[in-house]
């Protein structure tokens, strides 16, 4: 019966997402190295690169997950990081997207990823000019027979962490901090709100957007206002901006270790970001995380390209059933009762 409710709730989520409407941190524009090769060859000849959005590969979120997937693929297939294997190009601002993608093409990479919906136009532009190169865009849909579009069912995982938040909250006030307001981030918000309301219709969900994926100070300011208004849980889908939410939660926990205050992480298991020590005792403000397996998707599509099965012109969507969306394995702050209820959905 619960699974039926989940299906109905998700239908409402998609509708809500339409009505309502990953994620990075700032670093210098650079690359790990540059490489080359011919398209669709064996592991020894195959090369692959990715272009980040304005976040770095150490953003503890979306871009980092993609890079970890590329690293895992390279190591699994005996590729070297550098001129003959796998590589990343880091973007410092929007103007770097086309430049970095073109640089990857000039270095003859067989497959070039654009990490994040902000790179959609740049990928389409360069892909149209280079029909013999394979491209993939993450979190968006781009046109072109040589472009694979990788998307996720973010509303599914957001619904589950919403259930957890709705059952965990003591104040019935919950916050959501999004990065740039868009159809994509609205999927997170709508799914989360639906999950909360499914188990706790009395809870209020305050949905706000920072307008930036790369502004930790803005995230901290927003979190301070939400926690100050009585929220005890905030879910962020804001990339590097979300790091500020963790900072504020940890500061408040440092001031009052007995206060129940939590953050729900995104994209990766962000338990490590919530860890702190007060008076020699260890605490963690991460309630759970909505894990979006960008790393898995990058590995999958890279392998298909290497095996001459590149899904150009296709939309590949990852959800719970495809093992592309899940709730984090680190669940120390959730009771077994709450975990059982989440599992029912």
Task: Give the residues covered by each predicted segment.
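Bacterial Sec-dependent N-terminal signal peptides
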Residues: 1-11
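C-terminal motif of bacterial Sec signal peptides marking the signal peptidase cleavage site
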Residues: 18-22
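A residue-level marker of the well-folded mature domains of exported/periplasmic proteins
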Residues: 25-29, 33-345
């Amino acid at each position: 019966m619960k699974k039926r409710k989940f299906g109905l709730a998700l239908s409402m989520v998609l509708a809500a997402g339409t009505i309502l409407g990953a994620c990075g941190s700032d670093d210098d524009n650079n690359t790990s190295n540059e490489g080359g090769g011919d398209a669709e060859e064996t592991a020894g000849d195959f090369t692959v690169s990715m272009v980040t959005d304005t976040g770095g590969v150490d953003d503890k979120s979306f871009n980092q997950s993609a890079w970890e997937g590329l690293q895992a693929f390279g190591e699994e297939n005996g590729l070297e990081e550098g001129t003959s294997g796998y590589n990343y190009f880091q973007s410092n601002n929007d103007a770097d997207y086309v430049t970095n993608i073109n640089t990857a093409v000039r270095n003859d990479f067989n497959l070039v990823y654009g990490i994040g919906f902000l790179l959609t136009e740049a990928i389409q532009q360069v892909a149209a000019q280079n029909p013999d190169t394979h491209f993939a865009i993450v979190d968006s849909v781009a046109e072109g027979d040589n472009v694979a579009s990788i998307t996720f069912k973010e509303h599914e995982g957001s619904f589950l962490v919403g259930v957890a938040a709705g059952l965990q909250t003591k104040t019935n006030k919950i916050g959501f901090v999004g990065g740039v307001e868009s159809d994509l981030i609205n999927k997170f918000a709508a799914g989360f709100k639906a999950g909360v309301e499914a188990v706790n219709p009395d809870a209020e969900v305050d949905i706000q957007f920072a307008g930036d994926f790369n502004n930790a100070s803005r995230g901290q300011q927003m979190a301070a206002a939400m926690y100050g208004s009585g929220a005890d849980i905030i879910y962020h889908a804001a990339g590097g901006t979300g790091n500020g939410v963790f900072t504020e939660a940890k500061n408040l926990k440092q001031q009052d270790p007995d206060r129940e205050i939590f953050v729900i992480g995104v994209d990766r298991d962000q338990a490590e970001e919530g860890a702190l020590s007060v008076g020699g005792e260890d605490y963690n403000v991460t309630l759970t995380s909505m894990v979006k397996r960008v790393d898995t998707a990058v590995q999958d599509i890279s392998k298909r390209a290497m095996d001459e099965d590149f899904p150009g012109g296709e939309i590949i969507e990852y959800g719970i059933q495809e093992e592309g969306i899940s709730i984090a394995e680190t669940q120390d702050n959730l009771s077994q009762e709450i975990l059982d209820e989440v599992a029912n959905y």
